[in-house]
């Protein structure tokens, strides 16, 4: 079972994926938690290149291709082997993030970004997606400081609004999306996720 956690920066998905992972471990499920960009030694090196705040001259196409390259390695080295061992895979970001951030946020076009990423993942799609729905104004308020923000997190409000609107556009055409109200408390959001996992027969 392959489950991805998607949402804008500051939506709380990284906190919740850890709680879901801990819950599954405590209940003796065979599960791994991973992230994008990154998730394997080579993919993590690509992550560092993408998010380094010194790489301000990185072109948008370069950025999109690096995300796809990281994803290809991540699938081959981490995700697919785990799925072949019948493990539950929880992944913090996947394909839809690239469609929203590079396809819409960077203006490269959803279909252009989809094409390079579908080549990268080679047919390995999530069984379903948990989308953490919260508007960009709220997410920006949640960030205590930009001092530790990465290159994309440092983008202005207009960029993050485009990304959020991109997510909304993409969700209308994608299947197997579960909308999580991420404006609620951590415990309430966690409970929503557990209910989805039960309904989806993961638990």
Swiss-Prot record:
Family the UniProt entry places it in: Belongs to the thymidylate kinase family.
Protein name (database record): Thymidylate kinase
Family matches, as Gene3D superfamilies: P-loop containing nucleotide triphosphate hydrolases
PROSITE patterns in the record: THYMIDYLATE_KINASE
GO molecular function, one term: dTMP kinase activity
Keyword presence, NAD: no
Pfam families, A to Z: Thymidylate_kin
GO biological process: dTDP biosynthetic process; dTTP biosynthetic process; dUDP biosynthetic process
Residue ranges the record marks as coiled coil: none
Annotated organism of origin: Finegoldia magna (strain ATCC 29328 / DSM 20472 / WAL 2508) (Peptostreptococcus magnus)
Keywords, comma-separated and alphabetical: ATP-binding, Kinase, Nucleotide biosynthesis, Nucleotide-binding, Transferase
Chain's role: Phosphorylation of dTMP to form dTDP in both de novo and salvage pathways of dTTP synthesis.
GO cellular component, one term: cytosol
Domain of life assignment: Bacteria
């Amino acid at each position: 079972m392959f489950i991805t956690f998607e949402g804008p920066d500051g939506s709380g998905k990284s906190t919740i994926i850890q709680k879901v992972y801990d819950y599954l471990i405590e209940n003796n499920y065979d599960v791994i938690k991973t992230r994008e960009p990154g998730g394997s030694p080579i993919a993590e090196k690509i992550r560092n290149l993408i998010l380094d705040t010194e790489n301000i001259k990185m072109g948008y196409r370069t950025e999109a291709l690096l995300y796809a390259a990281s994803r290809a390695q991540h699938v081959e080295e981490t995700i697919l082997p785990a799925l072949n061992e019948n493990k539950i895979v929880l992944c913090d970001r996947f394909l839809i993030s690239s469609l929203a951030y590079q396809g819409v946020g960077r203006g490269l076009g959803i279909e252009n970004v989809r094409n390079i990423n579908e080549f990268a993942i080679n047919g390995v799609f999530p069984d379903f997606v948990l989308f953490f729905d919260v508007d960009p104004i709220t997410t920006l308020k949640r960030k205590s400081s930009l001092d530790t923000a990465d290159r994309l997190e440092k983008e202005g409000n207009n960029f993050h609004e485009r990304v959020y609107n991109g997510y909304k556009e993409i969700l209308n055409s994608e299947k197997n999306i579960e909308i999580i109200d991420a404006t609620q408390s951590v415990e309430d959001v966690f409970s929503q996720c557990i209910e989805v996992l039960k309904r989806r027969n993961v638990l």
